[in-house]
Amino acid sequence: MSRIGKKAVAVPSGVTVTIDGQTVTVKGPKGQLAWTVAEEIEVRQEGAEILLSKRDESTRAQAMWGLSRTLVNNMVVGVTQGYEQTLELVGVGYRAAMKGQALSMQLGFSHDVDVAPPAGITFATPKQTEIKISGIDKQLVGETAARIRRLRPPEPYKGKGVRYAGENVRRKEGKKK
């Protein structure tokens, strides 16, 4: 069983953490994030560390302990460094371009696909076949990347589609004559 909950979350200088009941608010140079911790978990701040402990020994408390610690750590990292996800477009004529704040993609459909960024997310297209998604909320960055990938997932025969940078797409052999 994982014991990640025992590890304290280090709070770097320039980051302020406010604990109000079960709500943890983290403010940093890149922005502010808030999250409500489960009732089974107790949160306290000692100096430059955030400590989480279980209120009881239930199975749910054990599960929420490690999860809560990781989510609070993700918040601290998000407001200091931020998160970034890179997508690649593979295929003839597949390209992306910025249209104001929104992302406009040609993915082999009869029309362009436009995606507006959710609050707190920014898009960038360093190359026509590359999309960078960045923000302070790790979960929202990953969800936005998955939503864009879902528009045209990589297919197994030619490998065309939208894929994560470094993703290994399993290829299949075509029909034999």
From Swiss-Prot:
The keyword rRNA-binding applies. GO terms for molecular function: rRNA binding; structural constituent of ribosome. InterPro entries: Ribosomal_uL6-like, Ribosomal_uL6-like_a/b-dom_sf, Ribosomal_uL6_a/b-dom, Ribosomal_uL6_bac-type, Ribosomal_uL6_CS. Gene3D superfamilies: Ribosomal protein L6, alpha-beta domain. Keywords: Ribonucleoprotein, Ribosomal protein, RNA-binding, rRNA-binding. GO terms for biological process: cytoplasmic translation. Residues 151-177 are annotated as: Disordered. GO terms for cellular component: cytosolic large ribosomal subunit. Belongs to the universal ribosomal protein uL6 family. Part of the 50S ribosomal subunit. This protein binds to the 23S rRNA, and is important in its secondary structure. It is located near the subunit interface in the base of the L7/L12 stalk, and near the tRNA binding site of the peptidyltransferase center. This is Large ribosomal subunit protein uL6. It comes from Phenylobacterium zucineum (strain HLK1).
